């Protein structure tokens, strides 16, 4: 069995190399064509439909060789080899280093702060030690009751 995947429409065709007239096509040990066919080719359809499996063509002598088909269809895949992985690791180390340097320099700056209202202290006049309490209402809980 040979594979022809150089079709314009992207289809995958299997070619049975035999001199026999009657051929049976099998996929994963299951019959996919009748034994009376004389087609030496079998169309698996488009390669994007992922035509995986073990294919065989058997003649009347029941001798065949199998062919395993496996298409790896990946649109956005990256080939991971040693150089790619080393590039990822190097880029990660450099970015962490630059981030650490940036945080160090920004955190180490002593900039001029704007004073806020909460930073100002209210000073007591005339050097008083204590500030007198403000007037308050006497409610029912401010006095003890006599029984």
From Swiss-Prot:
Where does the record place the modification Phosphoserine?
Answer: 115, 118
Instruction: Please state what the protein is called.
Output: T-cell surface glycoprotein CD3 gamma chain
Name which cysteines form disulfide bonds. 16-57
* Keyword set, alphabetical order: Adaptive immunity, Cell membrane, Disulfide bond, Glycoprotein, Immunity, Immunoglobulin domain, Membrane, Phosphoprotein, Receptor, Transmembrane, Transmembrane helix
Q: Please give the GO cellular component terms listed in this UniProt entry.
A: alpha-beta T cell receptor complex; external side of plasma membrane
Q: Which domain of life is it from?
A: Eukaryota
Which of the residues are on side Cytoplasmic?
A: 107-147
What does the comment on domains in this protein's record state?
A: A di-leucine motif and a tyrosine-based motif are individually sufficient to induce both endocytosis and delivery to lysosomes.
Self-association and partners = The TCR-CD3 complex is composed of a CD3D/CD3E and a CD3G/CD3E heterodimers that preferentially associate with TCRalpha and TCRbeta, respectively, to form TCRalpha/CD3E/CD3G and TCRbeta/CD3G/CD3E trimers. In turn, the hexamer interacts with CD3Z homodimer to form the TCR-CD3 complex. Alternatively, TCRalpha and TCRbeta can be replaced by TCRgamma and TCRdelta.
**Example of a GO MF term:** transmembrane signaling receptor activity
Q: Where is the secretion signal located?
A: none
Organism this protein belongs to: Ovis aries
User: TM spans, by residue?
Assistant: 86-106
For side Extracellular, which residue ranges? 1-85
């Amino acid at each position: 069995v040979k594979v022809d995947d150089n079709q314009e429409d992207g289809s995958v065709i299997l070619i049975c190399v035999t001199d026999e007239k009657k051929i049976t096509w099998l996929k994963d040990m299951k019959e996919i064509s009748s034994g009376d066919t004389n087609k030496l080719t079998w169309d698996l359809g488009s390669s994007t439909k992922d035509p995986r499996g073990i294919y065989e063509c058997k003649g009347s002598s029941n001798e065949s060789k199998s062919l395993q088909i496996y298409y790896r269809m990946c649109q956005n895949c990256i080939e991971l080899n040693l150089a790619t992985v080393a590039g990822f690791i190097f880029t990660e180390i450099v970015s962490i280093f630059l981030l650490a340097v940036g945080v160090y320099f920004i955190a180490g700056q002593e900039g001029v702060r704007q004073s806020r209202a909460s930073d100002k202290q209210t000073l007591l006049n005339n050097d008083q030690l204590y500030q007198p309490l403000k007037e308050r209402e006497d409610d029912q809980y401010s006095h003890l009751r006599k029984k």
